[in-house]
Amino acid sequence: MKKILATMMLAGSIVHAADVPVMNVPTVNQRMKSARTAIAQSDWRTAKFETQKVVDEEPSNADAHNLLAYTYRKQEKPDLAKAFEHYKTALKLNPQHKGAHEYIGEAYLMDRKPAMAEQHLSDLEKICGNRQCEEYQDLAKALAAYRKANP
């Protein structure tokens, strides 16, 4: 009798479980796409949420650390300490990460440390093999603008 009762309870719970809707958890790629869309719209809150979820799920994802740092730097009240933390993590995970070199260089300019930005510009020249890659060009322009504004 106990076996029959246990079987009926188990069967009932399986039927009940079948009625519960399945939640689709976004994949890392979906979260990164959502974060990039949010960044394009300057929706820093959503971008930070999505990239933080990716970092939590994949702590060794250099792209996620780079984008999370970017959101900390670009939000209304920049948090450069958090930005530097995640840029450095991205570069530790992937020392050749061109985007992280560009963005940490720009963060150093915000922090009034142009010599540090120049070091990352030099790193980009080596990584790119020339001065033509987009990341090098963007950081070079930011550095030139900084020097013009701060003679």
Which residues fall in each region the model found?
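Alpha-helical segment of the N-proximal tetratricopeptide repeat
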Residues: P26-D56
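Terminal, low-structured helical/coil segments at or just beyond the last alpha-helical repeat
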Residues: A18-N29, E118-P151
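Structural signature of tandem alpha-helical TPR/SEL1-like repeats
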Residues: Q41-F49, E76-T89, R112-D123
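Register position in tetratricopeptide repeats
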Residues: A40-Q41, K74-E76, M110, A142-A149
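Canonical tetratricopeptide repeat
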Residues: L67, Y103, L139-A142
